[in-house]
Amino acid sequence: MSCVLTGVVPLGLVLLLCGAQGFFLPNVTQLEKLLSKYQGDQPHSRTRRAISRADREEILTLHNKLRGQVSPPASNMEYMTWDEELEKSAVAWARECIWEHGPTSLLVSIGQNLAVHWGRPRSPGSHVQSWYDEVKDYTYPYPHECNPWCPERCSGPMCTHYTQIVWATTNRIGCAVNTCPRMNVWGDVWENAVYLVCNYFPKGNWIGEAPYKTGQPCSECPGKYRGGCKNNLCYQETYGQETETDDMNEVEAAPIPDEKHVWVTPRVIKPKKPKKDSPVNYMTQVVKCDTKMKDKCKGSTCNRYQCPAGCLHSGAKIFGTLFYESASSICRAAIHYGILDDRGGLVDVTRNGKVPFFVKSERNGVQSLSKYKASSSFTVSKVKVQDLDCYTTVAQLCPYEKPGTHCPRVRCPAHCKDEPSYWAPVFGSNIYADTSSICKTAVHAGVIRNESGGYVDVMPVDKKKTYVASLRNGVQSESLRTPRDGKAFRIFAVRQ
């Protein structure tokens, strides 16, 4: 083996905003395989943590201390808390003993800092401090320099460890330490290398953005903090309620409290009328062979239609070729264009502006007519059907573009509700941010059942200024205010 001097190597991560849509998250099988590494053989077995309580406290305390003393001061820096799920994902990667960021499938959702050393013992806090010390090479980009994107001001080899630590909206962290018997570090094999992995959520290091807003500390905290401020950090009082009390850092079942009996007079409850089921919204409209585009398209959901069988020999008229006049039969136009046959099926419609004239032609057994008068037009396209995992977003699948975007009809697997929000987030209610998991959103909206999954239709729309959180069907969505990028979507049930 090569002789390597005792040393420390950090590794930082930059996530490209423009490239995030290119990532696809793991399917259920891969995720279960990853999470199975955290689970013992017995559901209540005692297992020692991959990081000691002292190291955990040191890492978390130092992060919050450093975040509270940035210069220039931050107006929106959030207090950071420890997250068990992030710790588990860090444990899984640390045990791989691979000197690179990973796993790739998770990097779309999390930020990550890495460090490794061998020889003389070092505390995890010393690595955190070395990450932060990159500040000496970093110049903060003030608002007037961002037009709209902020310049990258790093005069050293790397500043991304520092920027991830002080990324204002990153408010959760989970780390793990693992001793690797043999670890390849840039071509050299280190024996008994101590590997530190820290995962962060929400991720930071977005290219073109400043890590935080500058100003009076806590003057621009998100509304959920309700004015709370501690050591220059946006703070919620609930943070102080520590639940873990085991100083040995072992996980075991909590003791059952002593049983107490409270005698009360039972209250008489009047029977309530059964609640009416909420109306189910469908994007796909069921039409007849003679249904005209101008008669049916009178709302936002007029871009997908279910045509019946037997329209080939219907007497319904169509006008034009490729571009069809709005008085044309939707289903006959789809057969003329070659999207459907006489068996019927799904067709997507795109509304267009006025066309000066429409030319007749005969295609696929359907004769269209001419009309030499300017009129509104539409085009037709085939509806694809695609299977998804629990993590795919509209931003990845079919982001909104003007004048409109058609998404495939998608089939969601079962049990997406159980996926953690780091990998399958949901932002909003009724109208959702397009960075939300499609299938978990479908459960939240009530268009599919979590136990069975199923087909859904999605409609990309332009972005909203705010997305409001809500708890529906066992799924807690998150709020999102004034998003700089990204669009939105609506989600609909499919008739079975």
From Swiss-Prot:
<keyword id="KW-0677">Repeat</keyword>
<protein>
    <recommendedName>
        <fullName>Cysteine-rich secretory protein LCCL domain-containing 2</fullName>
    </recommendedName>
</protein>
<keyword id="KW-0964">Secreted</keyword>
<feature type="domain" description="SCP">
    <location>
        <begin position="60"/>
        <end position="200"/>
    </location>
</feature>
<dbReference type="InterPro" id="IPR051957">
    <property type="entry name" value="CRISP-LCCL_domain"/>
</dbReference>
<keyword id="KW-1015">Disulfide bond</keyword>
<dbReference type="GO" id="GO:0005539">
    <property type="term" value="F:glycosaminoglycan binding"/>
</dbReference>
<dbReference type="Pfam" id="PF03815">
    <property type="entry name" value="LCCL"/>
</dbReference>
<dbReference type="InterPro" id="IPR004043">
    <property type="entry name" value="LCCL"/>
</dbReference>
<dbReference type="GO" id="GO:0005615">
    <property type="term" value="C:extracellular space"/>
</dbReference>
<dbReference type="InterPro" id="IPR035940">
    <property type="entry name" value="CAP_sf"/>
</dbReference>
<dbReference type="InterPro" id="IPR036609">
    <property type="entry name" value="LCCL_sf"/>
</dbReference>
<feature type="disulfide bond">
    <location>
        <begin position="416"/>
        <end position="439"/>
    </location>
</feature>
<dbReference type="InterPro" id="IPR001283">
    <property type="entry name" value="CRISP-related"/>
</dbReference>
<feature type="disulfide bond">
    <location>
        <begin position="311"/>
        <end position="331"/>
    </location>
</feature>
<dbReference type="InterPro" id="IPR014044">
    <property type="entry name" value="CAP_dom"/>
</dbReference>
<dbReference type="InterPro" id="IPR018244">
    <property type="entry name" value="Allrgn_V5/Tpx1_CS"/>
</dbReference>
<comment type="subunit">
    <text>Binds to heparin, dermatan sulfate and chondroitin sulfate.</text>
</comment>
<feature type="domain" description="LCCL 1">
    <location>
        <begin position="283"/>
        <end position="378"/>
    </location>
</feature>
<feature type="signal peptide">
    <location>
        <begin position="1"/>
        <end position="22"/>
    </location>
</feature>
<feature type="disulfide bond">
    <location>
        <begin position="289"/>
        <end position="307"/>
    </location>
</feature>
<feature type="glycosylation site" description="N-linked (GlcNAc...) asparagine">
    <location>
        <position position="27"/>
    </location>
</feature>
<keyword id="KW-0732">Signal</keyword>
<dbReference type="GO" id="GO:0060325">
    <property type="term" value="P:face morphogenesis"/>
</dbReference>
<feature type="disulfide bond">
    <location>
        <begin position="390"/>
        <end position="412"/>
    </location>
</feature>
<dbReference type="Pfam" id="PF00188">
    <property type="entry name" value="CAP"/>
</dbReference>
<feature type="domain" description="LCCL 2">
    <location>
        <begin position="384"/>
        <end position="487"/>
    </location>
</feature>
<comment type="function">
    <text>Promotes matrix assembly.</text>
</comment>
<keyword id="KW-0325">Glycoprotein</keyword>
